[in-house]
Amino acid sequence: MKQRIYIEGDNLDALKILLGSYRNRIKMIYIDPPYNTGKDFVYHDNRTETELEHLESTNQLNEDGQLLENPKTEGKYHSNWLNMMYPRLYLAKKLLKEDGVLIISIDENEIKNLLEICSEIFGEDNIDTAIWQKVDNDSGKMKITYRMRLEHEYVIFCYKNKNKSFFNKFIEERNYKNEYTNPDNDPRGPWISALISNTEENSNPNSDLYYDITTPSGKVITRQWRVEKWEMDELIKDNRIYFGNKGESAPRLKSFINEPKLSTPATLFSNVGTAKTAGKMIEDIMGDRKVFSYPKPTELLEHLIRIVTDSRFSLNPKKSSKRKVFFPGADMGIDLNDENEIILDFFSGSSTTAHAILKVNNEDNLKRKFIMVQLPEKTDEKSKPYKEGYKNICEIGKERIRRAGDKILEESDNKDLDIGFKVFKIDESNFIPWNPKIKTEKEVEQAILGTANNIVQGRSELDLVYELLLQFGLDLNAEVEEKQVNNHKFYVVNNGFLLICLNPNIDESIAQDILNLKEDLMTEYCRVILLDEALNSVSSINIFNDLNSEDIELDTI
């Protein structure tokens, strides 16, 4: 079953649409937005202007009508870009789960300003910054700035709630054998310990992780811990917490010699691919690295995906082998992350994020889902991508996902890996809206007659079905299947949670068909949607009464 989504269209529109069904549901959002280079800028959010009017009103055209660059001497050099980013980041926060994180790749031009708006939206305490080394030390070509070689870019982490975000740890290669002891004669062997709390002065009394612990000696210690109370109780019960020789010291978490030594992810990403390896990956998958400029390496995205969404398996960036890691509660079967986590990228470009998700899903057998969003920005007619048939960036991104999935399946024995994805395009609603500007009685009469069928011509039944899913708060991965019952075709959503019949002509017999279908599906709750034009006033009342008596809700469109 296809559990992944690709959306073509403006990402601001996409975020607004997704909000109804995906609010508080996204675990990780990664974006690599267009950097503010002063060149042509394709994201304009004032929908009252045409593209030409916008360029003219913002003084982006010269006397000959040619596009100007966005020079730093222009007062709006930074504000134009930041005004584009702000509403998108604001909506992105609403989509994140409580333990979710937004990750942004950015260069030196806007790091300072971007950090300011991220702090305003997410809160200053919910921001971290890392550095990605984007070139090898021996790389021949690199940007020179201020007499120095520019070898890095920035990665910003914006947490919805930093106290609830959990980052997976990575295995260190050091030999720690000399540091292990066994002062309490634990039968599991020698161990070392680590703090499992903030210091008393750095604890937040308002945090959900702020609670009391009573030591074996009876001493009460109150501070902000790094695990929830129920998990701490389980760790104490399992003798994984050490309170010192006298049983009165601050708790420390024990890690045994036969368990890997773990390290928190560092702020320097130096072994997770470079711009050069990213280009090589594009070449391997698409046949030519010139198909897409400035992609991020899949290794970087794989690293980010693992530390955010996987509590059980992590990859040491220096190695290629999969390794099992320990986290507090692992021995008790505590799963801190959902194997079906959703990852969103709303500047998806060549679909590096989707490619990376397919790779890590194949390696650890989890079922992460993705939502890719990309504006169908046209490729230059003189460019190689255009000549090879890629008329816009979306065509490149979709083809990369297909080829990457096929390559992964070909090279692995994981025949259960789901590599399929659904494609949606943002457009005007499938339903004709009422025009509020009509005033005269004749205009009202014509409007009523003209909207007896209020569905836009040329739209398919599935177009209507998926818009209705979003209107009713269901996501785009909802199960949809067709079922024919006598003369009526139904779209059955999520095993009968929603039944949609778009037949233009129906009679009162549909009520019994619905009752029979509900019984066959063995569903308790059921909501039915019918076309308003398919009903007359009498049949509508009778059908409503028949269904209402069986606790089935009826809506018409």
Positions of predicted regions on the chain:
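Class I S-adenosyl-L-methionine
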Residues: 1-342, 364, 375-380
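SAM-dependent nucleic-acid methyltransferase catalytic core
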Residues: 1-91, 246, 261-267, 271-272, ...
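A phosphate-binding catalytic loop at a beta-strand-loop-alpha-helix junction
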Residues: 31, 339-360, 469
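Conserved phosphoryl-transfer catalytic core
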Residues: 51-72, 372-431
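Short, contiguous acidic/charged loop-to-helix segments that flank catalytic cores in large enzymes
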Residues: 76-80, 285-293, 342-345, 362, ...
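Short beta-alpha connecting loops at secondary-structure transitions
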Residues: 137-144, 377-390, 446-454
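Short, surface-exposed amphipathic charged segments that create phosphate/polyanion-binding patches used
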Residues: 141-149, 386-388, 436-443, 544
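Post-Walker A helix-loop "phosphate-sensing" segment adjacent to the P-loop in P-loop NTPases
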Residues: 360-366
